């Protein structure tokens, strides 16, 4: 009898179809029981997720019709009530500096855990291109990191990377509610990406969390892109189901919510209230927040942003957002985390490198003086400077939760949070948006979601800001300064700018890399997005189908 030549496949439960490439290492993550756990989460919560996504669309329709975001009168009692969240886990009381980066590649995970930061936020979201290989390798990496066994052999350099005796505490950021996982079908539908990310990570690691995170705590998460407290309520339900299934103490799972959408800034108390048993505070996701400001006000010609380089924390609406977040978190007894420092070391120019570090120091001094308890960094080289600023101000305290810091937020009003930003709009700004947006998207399509560009570590938020700003300027025919001459933003101007900037990118990266990369494809997608009649919600959602690779041989075995 001839030996079977059937391709190996994943052992999936009824109703689950794995379409991603089969790999024996991945099969250790995609076990039957793990997939059954993820499927159970999806089946229980998919109706609530669909409703929440429809409510997002309905809210946007109201904003497009002229309504402005505001505090919800129906939840006044929550905002004014005297309540606090569960006490801070002792193991993560000190979060003065957190380093962020994708969960894959493996060497980057090890370096981040060894970086000297208090926390490493391993990302399945904006800093990762969600290819099948990245997602599955990321789960393998985090399983090994939690176990303390992760290592990497760099054969060409003859170097082995391993964990130090003391490492950063591990947080994990799953994708947002809106993103699917098309390589896994549940009852014929794409899986909800964040439930795959969280579900697989939790299932394989919950028994080991206590050793690394502190007894009775874990996992620790960051939750992105929420717009309303109903979305936090779903996460709370997911956490409760997971804790019950694992037989661990309620409240073991803790999550920091990134306030990175304009609607969410009006829902911060409500979000914390929904997650009060599981909350680890809020974070100023400032780059995506700018993106969301444009998207929310896409139909409002009186709210055009200036060049994105001018939209910093000195703008009134950004400063108000930061102050209100700090006040809200400290009132509820949780961490108020600051925003990302995206600078990366400039190795060949000491003066430029010191100037960049000085910008980081000033930004972080502003944050800690305002009352933030910690902040984010994109590169290990920033950590010593940031720690010096925060630790020098805190004077040995792990955080400012019990202090009066952040009282400025008590007086923030609705109009403060939506005040139009000031500054010039220029053709140079349009050019930079094209140049950075196209290069980021090309890297994302090629499998990299954390991309060094012009001495900054960029993630998807940069491409999103660049895209929606160009779209907004074109949609409303914004007047742009072209070296002292006023020109109107038009599709014809954008086409010329794209052609010229693509040539510049080719000159910068070299013809061979340009030809082999996905730059031309990225240029077409970016141009189409900027000139579309209707603004797409997310660039990464539109481009996702271009990185999905179904392998029929990987489908579950049929006996």
From Swiss-Prot:
One of its GO terms (molecular function) is malate synthase activity. The active site is at 173 (proton acceptor), 459 (proton donor). The keyword Cytoplasm does not apply. Its EC number is 2.3.3.9. InterPro entries: Malate_synth_C_sf, Malate_synth_sf, Malate_synthA, Malate_synthase_CS, Malate_synthase_TIM, MS_C, MS_N, MS_N_TIM-barrel_dom. Keywords: Glyoxylate bypass, Glyoxysome, Peroxisome, Transferase, Tricarboxylic acid cycle. Pathway: Carbohydrate metabolism; glyoxylate cycle; (S)-malate from isocitrate: step 2/2. It comes from the Eukaryota. The keyword Transmembrane does not apply. It is an enzyme of class 2 (transferase). Its main location: other. It catalyses: glyoxylate + acetyl-CoA + H2O = (S)-malate + CoA + H(+). It is found in: Glyoxysome. A motif (Microbody targeting signal) lies at residues 557-559. Signal peptide: none annotated. Belongs to the malate synthase family. This is Malate synthase, glyoxysomal.
């Amino acid at each position: 009898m001839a030996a079977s030549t059937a391709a190996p496949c994943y052992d999936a439960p009824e109703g689950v179809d794995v379409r991603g490439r089969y790999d024996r290492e991945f099969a250790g993550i995609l076990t039957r029981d793990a997939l059954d756990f993820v499927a159970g989460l999806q089946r229980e919560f998919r109706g609530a997720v669909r409703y929440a996504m429809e409510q997002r669309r309905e809210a946007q329709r109201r904003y497009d019709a002229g309504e402005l975001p505001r505090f919800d009168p129906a939840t006044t009692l929550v905002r004014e009530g005297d309540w606090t969240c569960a006490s801070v886990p002792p193991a993560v009381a000190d979060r003065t500096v957190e380093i962020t980066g994708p969960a894959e590649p493996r060497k980057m995970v090890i370096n981040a855990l060894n970086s000297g930061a208090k926390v490493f936020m391993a990302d399945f979201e904006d800093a990762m291109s969600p290819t099948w290989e990245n997602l599955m390798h990321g789960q393998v990496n985090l399983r090994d990191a939690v176990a303390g066994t992760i290592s990497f052999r760099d054969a060409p350099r003859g170097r082995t990377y391993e964990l130090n005796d003391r490492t950063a505490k591990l947080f994990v950021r799953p994708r947002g509610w809106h993103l699917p996982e098309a390589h896994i079908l549940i009852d014929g539908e794409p899986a909800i990406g964040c439930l795959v990310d969280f579900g697989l990570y939790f299932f394989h690691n919950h028994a080991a969390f206590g050793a690394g995170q502190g007894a009775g705590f874990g996992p620790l998460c960051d939750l992105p892109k929420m717009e309303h407290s109903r979305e936090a309520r779903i996460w709370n339900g997911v956490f409760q189901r997971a804790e019950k299934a694992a037989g661990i103490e309620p409240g073991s799972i803790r999550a920091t919510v990134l306030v990175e959408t304009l609607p969410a800034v009006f829902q911060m108390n409500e979000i914390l209230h929904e997650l009060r048993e599981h909350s680890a505070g809020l974070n100023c996701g400032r780059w995506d927040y700018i993106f969301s400001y444009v998207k929310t006000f896409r139909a409002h010609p009186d709210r055009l942003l200036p060049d994105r380089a001018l939209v910093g924390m000195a703008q009134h609406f950004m400063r108000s957002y930061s102050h209100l977040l700090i006040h809200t978190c400290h009132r509820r007894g949780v961490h108020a985390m600051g925003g990302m420092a995206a600078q990366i070391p400039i190795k060949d120019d000491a003066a430029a490198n010191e100037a960049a570090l000085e910008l980081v120091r000033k930004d972080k001094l502003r944050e800690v003086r305002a009352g933030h308890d910690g902040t984010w960094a994109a590169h290990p080289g920033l950590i010593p400077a940031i720690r010096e600023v925060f630790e020098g101000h805190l004077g040995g305290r792990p955080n400012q939760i019990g202090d009066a810091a952040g009282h400025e937020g008590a007086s923030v009003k609705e109009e403060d949070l939506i005040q139009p930003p000031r500054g010039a709009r220029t053709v140079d700004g349009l050019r930079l948006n094209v140049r950075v947006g196209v290069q980021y998207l090309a890297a994302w399509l090629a499998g990299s979601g954390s991309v060094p560009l012009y001495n900054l570590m960029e993630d998807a938020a940069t491409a999103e800001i660049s895209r929606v700003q160009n779209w907004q300027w074109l949609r409303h025919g914004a007047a742009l300064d072209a070296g002292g001459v006023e020109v109107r933003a038009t599709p014809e101007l954008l086409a010329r700018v794209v052609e010229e900037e693509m040539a510049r990118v080719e000159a910068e990266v070299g013809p061979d890399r340009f030809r082999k990369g996905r730059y031309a494809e990225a240029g077409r997608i970016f141009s189409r997005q900027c000139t579309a009649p209707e603004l797409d919600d997310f660039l990464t959602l539109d481009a996702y189908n271009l990185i999905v690779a179904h392998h029929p041989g990987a489908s579950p075995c049929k006996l």
